UniProtKB/Swiss-Prot annotation:
<dbReference type="GO" id="GO:0045794">
    <property type="term" value="P:negative regulation of cell volume"/>
</dbReference>
<dbReference type="InterPro" id="IPR047871">
    <property type="entry name" value="K_chnl_Slo-like"/>
</dbReference>
<feature type="topological domain" description="Extracellular">
    <location>
        <begin position="323"/>
        <end position="336"/>
    </location>
</feature>
<keyword id="KW-0406">Ion transport</keyword>
<keyword id="KW-0407">Ion channel</keyword>
<feature type="compositionally biased region" description="Gly residues">
    <location>
        <begin position="1"/>
        <end position="26"/>
    </location>
</feature>
<dbReference type="GO" id="GO:0048471">
    <property type="term" value="C:perinuclear region of cytoplasm"/>
</dbReference>
<feature type="topological domain" description="Cytoplasmic">
    <location>
        <begin position="287"/>
        <end position="301"/>
    </location>
</feature>
<dbReference type="GO" id="GO:0042311">
    <property type="term" value="P:vasodilation"/>
</dbReference>
<dbReference type="GO" id="GO:0099507">
    <property type="term" value="F:ligand-gated monoatomic ion channel activity involved in regulation of presynaptic membrane potential"/>
</dbReference>
<feature type="binding site">
    <location>
        <position position="986"/>
    </location>
    <ligand>
        <name>Ca(2+)</name>
    </ligand>
</feature>
<dbReference type="GO" id="GO:0007605">
    <property type="term" value="P:sensory perception of sound"/>
</dbReference>
<feature type="modified residue" description="Phosphoserine">
    <location>
        <position position="712"/>
    </location>
</feature>
<comment type="function">
    <text>Potassium channel activated by both membrane depolarization or increase in cytosolic Ca(2+) that mediates export of K(+). It is also activated by the concentration of cytosolic Mg(2+). Its activation dampens the excitatory events that elevate the cytosolic Ca(2+) concentration and/or depolarize the cell membrane. It therefore contributes to repolarization of the membrane potential.</text>
</comment>
<dbReference type="InterPro" id="IPR003929">
    <property type="entry name" value="K_chnl_BK_asu"/>
</dbReference>
<feature type="compositionally biased region" description="Low complexity">
    <location>
        <begin position="45"/>
        <end position="61"/>
    </location>
</feature>
<feature type="modified residue" description="Phosphoserine">
    <location>
        <position position="729"/>
    </location>
</feature>
């Protein structure tokens, strides 16, 4: 028996048995050593354990050579078939019978159903024919049994439908139960696949006891669940045949039945369990059910990966099965021992066509499978792998989410994100003069940044983050935490070809952001003024809560209009809200003084309690002399603190105003630290301090801070130019009641005549037809125009509108008297001007000369050499792709005008005897007379009275140029040219030495105020964020008084509405305006020759309530030798000790003059009531020289006390 034990069959004590056993051992040796070697000894011990077992083995061994079957391992714990016969066919048969049996039943059912339907159809036709033949002879009762049958059938159909619907709900991913079941089935399928990976290390077929094998028990439980889920799917399926042929169904057929067979036979066959890997194909669907995958790229990536991996693992399982089993027709003798993971490796090198040859298929089935697999696998590898790599490589590098930092604000910047727009924004937003900007900037754009922009982000990585996405997508808004952002800033493309489309895009961005979070503060750039009205249609848009729209066209044309009133003002204001560092120049050149002024910016600060009770001019003087600060305005808020609409910005309000607690002041200073002196100033501690740098927080201030505040702060805290302070509303006290026009004005007021718009902010006239204001060239030539504004406009019928109303409105502000209004003459295409006329027909003194600004005949016809200002605009700039050619029309027009030569203009004036008054022009006014426009010598130049850089010589003064010299050459015509491309500024002045790479603000044309580019307005975005009052102040200065209420009115009617002159509307005229003060003559002439700017500042403020804030100086005034150059440059906020020269023009804010509206022909003295005495101001001829006023009181207090009447000349 021991000798016979060498066979795998158990052997016997006889020779034949031993021989049989030997044959069995020989077969066992041909099989894999790792499968059978350890089981041979176990078989021997099993045969010697009992006699009954030995006799049974002996009898079985006799028949084994006849069966010629392979021997499988037999353990002593498992009561297995001692003959060692393979039973793989039983496992496979169970699957095949299930699949084909079910398929046969489905086909049989369909066939019977089809036959039954055909038969019923024929029978139905027969019954119908019988029913027609019988007609009405049959009683109604004969049809009741049929109805009852139909009700029974309907009931049955309803029951089956209910069950089917219930099953569909159970497996549908639309319900929570369905999603749970789908996810659970997928998870259990992966679990079954893991069990297969574990069992793959065992033999392909082995005897196992179900009650002792833990993995088999788990696999059995999984498959029971799969069977139940299969039943639900079968019930819910509409087409049973297609369901039976689905991949998931085939997987169940070849994995579920073999498990039950293995329990019955007490043996396990690895078989086709690897098909569970096909369930991985549904991985992307599972992730979508769980809302993990939301983007198309991520879904596609997971789909490709799941299909590739599942195919790979499934094919490896098949190779593992056939290679470890062998070919059936070879009696399973050509097998080889390969682990599953070696098969995975073999399939990978096969798909990739590498084929190292270290592992290969030996069986015919394996090789045949490899032949077909390499075709499909190679195609899949060649297409799927590159696409997977591309998707992974193209995954959004900036697709994460923003993580808010505790204690640190963040803003979201979106819209037009380019290298230029971002660099300009960051340069101003993160400027060192803003104190410590503890704000993180999050950029959101749907296009990934290029290398240059990416490098810019990396340089500012501590404060800047970029995320790829769109604000129109709520998911992307959630990624950047828009709900917790301090504000959202939307940048516009200033150079786009279609401004209306760009505005529409930004409006859609505002709608999307406001829809996601209505309370977010939004600051957006708009290109066209008329598109601002669409923002008012957004329900959550609220300018009272900080929402602002920066209209570039409105501000650009407003700046240019102010330059028509005081040339150089556009440059000064643009420099004030732009953050620029101080550049020190040692040489005594004009750049030295210009750059000293450029370093000044606009800031706000709450005034110290030491200023309480003082008048505005007194506080202004104290701040300028002692604190070295220039205060130009304060914030006024009515007693109703809950309403922000009652808040106003008062610019140089005059001496009637008394400051109380919590007044917010607007200052011009070089940095934010200097402005804090106004808050820290204490009369008790700092009264004797001469160095303003020593004015810091004192002990008195600390005691005040320790006291509990009486009013809670309400103003929103922002970093940068503003600081937090108790926000008590500044209560303003007037010595006099609300200013009302004098009795003589009220008596002469014609209530039936509308001279102003309904708000009283602008001059108004009845709408005029464009034909009434058109001048022909001959009519214009016969009309002697002088002191007017010539607007050269390039545009055609297809050009985008630039909004000329924004240019005209500041020139028609009601704080000018009618006779002070400059006549405006447009020179350009009549087709274009017709499109703009709808917004211009309510303004007086406007004429049109159809033509082209490049025609010298047209320019001579409008007397361009006698104009106060020539404005060159173009509506065609953004239609050209080449940026260097965008400004070609404006540059050509500018050079054309400068090259013109003019004869003696006095001869031209003689044509006035044969001329006529142009439409809207009142020739009866002395200011409109040709001689007045030519030879006037004003000491103060205001809206209509700015000379063409002409100072007439007087004894003791150095005349730089004469009248005829100025008029003979076009180079002396004052003009301002709008540019799109900053670098094109180099072409405006042929005699300057500006480098092409010089920044715009450092170039001579910009410093002189003869060029303006819209790019300078980019700084307003960050300035508005840090202090929303800055935008209000700038708009008040440049628009002539436009308010949100007026914008709402224009949005309704797209035109100004005329209003009657009432005391309330006339009171709105009482507001400050910009003027230029000449030092050649007048009361300040003594200071013009070597005097100090500080003395001029104090004298103008005390005497005339005029607030000086800058100088417009000749470029070569610092030279000791005379120069013929008449170019001037801007000096902003010079220091107290700054030396003046006689040719300087002083920028000042002057009060409204109520008496200038009376007849200018009379030079007699006039007196007014006390209401107007506090509002005395000066116009062109209103300030006499000091020598002519011997009775003038010595002190301002005595003048106020005596209420002495002003003398007008």
């Amino acid at each position: 028996m021991a000798n016979g034990g060498g066979g795998g069959g158990g052997g016997s004590s006889g020779s034949s048995g031993g021989g049989g056993g030997g044959g069995g051992g020989e077969t066992a040796l041909r099989m894999s050593s790792n499968i059978h070697a350890n089981h041979l000894s176990l078989d021997a011990s099993s045969s010697s354990s009992s006699s009954s077992s030995s006799s049974s083995s002996s009898s079985s061994s006799v028949h084994e050579p006849k069966m010629d079957a392979l021997i499988i391992p037999v353990t002593m714990e498992v009561p297995c078939d001692s003959r060692g016969q393979r039973m793989w066919w039983a496992f496979l048969a169970s699957s095949m019978v299930t699949f084909f049996g079910g398929l046969f039943i489905i086909l049989l059912w369909r066939t019977l159903k089809y036959l039954w339907t055909v038969c019923c159809h024929c029978g139905g036709k027969t019954k119908e024919a019988q029913k027609i033949n019988n007609g009405s002879s049959q009683a109604d009762g004969t049809l009741k049994p049929v109805d009852e049958k139909e009700e029974v059938v309907a009931a049955e159909v309803g029951w089956m439908t209910s069950v089917k619907d219930w099953a569909g709900v159970m497996i549908s991913a639309q319900t929570l139960t369905g999603r749970v079941l789908v996810v659970l089935v997928f998870a259990l399928s992966i679990g079954a696949l893991v069990i297969y990976f574990i069992d793959s290390s065992n033999p392909i077929e082995s005897c196992q006891n179900f009650y002792k094998d833990f993995t088999l028990q788990i696999d059995m439980a999984f498959n029971v669940f799969f069977l139940l889920y299969f039943g639900l799917r079968f019930i819910a399926a509409n087409d049973k045949l297609w369901f039976w042929l689905e991949v998931n169904s085939v997987v169940d057929f070849f994995t579920v039945p073999p498990v039950f067979v293995s329990v019955y036979l007490n043996r396990s066959w690895l078989g086709l369990r690897f098909l569970r890997a096909l369930r991985l194909i549904q991985f992307s669907e599972i992730l979508q059910f769980l809302n993990i995958l939301k983007t198309s790229n991520s879904i596609k990536l997971v789909n490709l990966l799941s299909i590739f991996i599942s195919t790979w693992l499934t094919a490896a399982g098949f190779i593992h099965l056939v290679e470890n089993s062998g070919d059936p027709w070879e009696n399973f003798q050509n097998n080889q021992a390969l682990t599953y993971w070696e098969c995975v490796y073999l399939l990978m090198v096969t798909m990739s066509t590498v084929g190292y040859g270290d592992v290969y298929a030996k069986t015919t089935l394996g090789r045949l499978f490899m032949v077909f697999f390499i075709l499909g696998g190679l195609a899949m590898f060649a297409s799927y792998v590159p696409e997977i790599i591309e998707l992974i490589g193209n995954r959004k590098k900036y697709g994460g989410s923003y993580s808010a930092v505790s204690g640190r604000k963040h803003i979201v910047v979106c819209g037009h994100i380019t290298l230029e727009s971002v660099s300009n924004f960051l340069k101003d937003f993160l400027h060192k003069d803003r104190d410590d900007v503890n704000v993180e900037i999050v950029f959101l754009h749907n296009i990934s940044p290029n290398l240059e922009l990416e490098a810019l982000f990396k340089r500012h990585f501590t404060q800047v983050e970029f995320y790829q996405g769109s604000v129109l997508n709520p998911h992307d808004l959630a990624r950047v935490k828009i709900e917790s952002a301090d504000a959202c800033l939307i940048l516009a493309n200033k150079y786009c070809a279609d401004p209306d489309a760009e505005d529409a895009s930004n409006i859609m961005r505002v709608i999307s952001i406001k829809n996601y979070h209505p309370k977010i503060r939004i600051i957006t750039q708009m290109l066209q003024y008329h598109n601002k009205a669409h923002l008012l249609n957004i329900p959550s848009w609220n300018w009272k809560e900080g929402d602002d729209a920066i209209c570039l066209a409105e501000l650009k044309l407003g700046f240019i209009a102010q330059s028509c009133l005081a040339q150089g003002l556009s440059t000064m204001l643009a420099n004030l809200f732009s953050m620029r560092s101080f550049i020190k120049i040692e040489e005594d050149t004009w750049q030295k003084y210009y750059l000293e002024g450029v370093s000044n910016e606009m800031y706000t600060e709450y005034l110290s309690s030491a200023f309480v009770g003082l008048s505005f001019p007194t506080v202004c003087e104290l701040c300028f002399v002692k604190l070295k600060l220039l205060m130009i305005a304060i914030e006024y808020k009515s007693a109703n603190r809950e309403s922000r609409s009652r808040k106003r910005i008062l610019i140089n309000p005059g001496n009637h105003l008394k400051i109380q607690e919590g007044t917010l002041g607007f200052f011009i200073a070089s940095d934010a630290k200097e402005v804090k002196r106004a808050f820290f100033y204490c009369k008790a501690c700092h009264d004797d301090v001469t160095d303003p740098k020593r004015i810091k927080k004192c002990g008195c201030r600390r005691l005040e801070d320790e006291q509990p505040p009486t009013l809670s702060p309400k103003k929103k805290q922002r970093n940068g130019g503003m600081r937090n302070s108790p926000n008590t509303s500044p209560k303003l006290m007037r010595h006099d009641p609300l200013l009302i026009p004098g009795n003589d004005q009220i008596d002469n007021m014609d209530s039936n005549v509308k001279k102003y718009d309904s708000t009283g902010m602008f001059h108004w006239c009845a709408p005029k037809e464009i034909e009434k204001v058109i001048l022909t060239r001959s009519e214009a030539a016969m009309t002697v125009l002088s002191g007017h504004v010539v607007v050269c406009i390039f545009g055609d019928v297809s050009s985008a509108l630039i909004g000329l109303r924004n240019l005209v409105m500041p020139l028609r502000a009601s704080n000018f008297h009618y006779h002070e209004l400059k006549h405006i003459v447009f020179v350009g295409s009549i087709e274009y001007l017709k499109r703009e006329w709808e917004t211009l027909h309510n303004f007086p003194k406007v004429s049109i000369l159809p033509g082209t600004p490049l025609s010298r005949a047209d320019l001579r016809a409008v007397n361009i050499n006698l104009c106060d200002m020539c404005v060159i605009l173009s509506a065609n700039q953004n239609n050209i792709d080449d940026t260097s050619l965008q400004d070609k029309e404006c540059i050509l027009a500018s050079l054309n005008i400068k090259s013109m030569q003019f004869d003696d203009s006095i001869g031209v004036l003689q044509a006035n005897s044969q001329g006529f008054t142009p439409p809207g022009m009142d020739r009866s006014s002395p200011d409109n007379s040709p001689v007045h426009g030519m030879l006037r010598q004003p000491s103060i130049t205001t809206g209509v009275n700015i000379p063409i850089i002409t100072e007439l010589a007087k004894p003791g003064k150095l005349p730089l140029v004469s009248v005829n010299q100025e008029k003979n050459s076009g180079t002396h015509i004052l003009m301002i040219t709008e540019l799109v491309n900053d670098t094109n500024v180099q072409f405006l002045d042929q005699d300057d030495d500006d480098d092409p790479d010089t920044e715009l603000y450092l170039t001579q044309p910009f410093a002189c105020g003869t060029a303006f580019a819209v790019s300078v307005l980019d700084s307003l975005m960050s300035a508005t964020y840090f202090n929303d009052n800055i935008l209000t102040l700038i708009r008040t200065l440049v628009t002539g008084g436009a308010t949100p209420e007026l914008e709402a009115l224009i949005a309704e009617e797209n035109a100004l509405r005329g209003g009657y002159s009432t005391p309330q509307t006339l009171a709105n005229r009482d507001r400050c305006r910009v003027a230029q003060l000449a030092l050649l003559d007048g009361p300040f002439a003594d200071l013009g020759d070597g005097g100090c700017y500080g003395d001029l500042f104090c004298k103008a403020l005390k005497t005339y309530n005029m607030l000086c804030f800058g100088i417009y100086r000749l470029r070569d005034a610092h030279l000791s030798t005379p120069s013929q150059c008449t170019k001037r440059y801007v000096i902003t906020n010079p220091p107290y000790e700054f030396e003046l020269v006689p040719t300087d023009l002083i920028f000042c804010l002057m009060q409204f003059d109520h008496n200038a509206g009376q007849s200018r022909a009379s030079l007699s003295h006039s007196s007014h009531s006390s209401q107007s005495s506090s509002k005395k101001s000066s116009s062109v001829h209103s300030i006499p020289s000091t020598a002519n006023r011997p009775n003038r009181p010595k002190s301002r207090e005595s003048r106020d006390k005596q209420k002495k009447e002003m003398v007008y000349r």
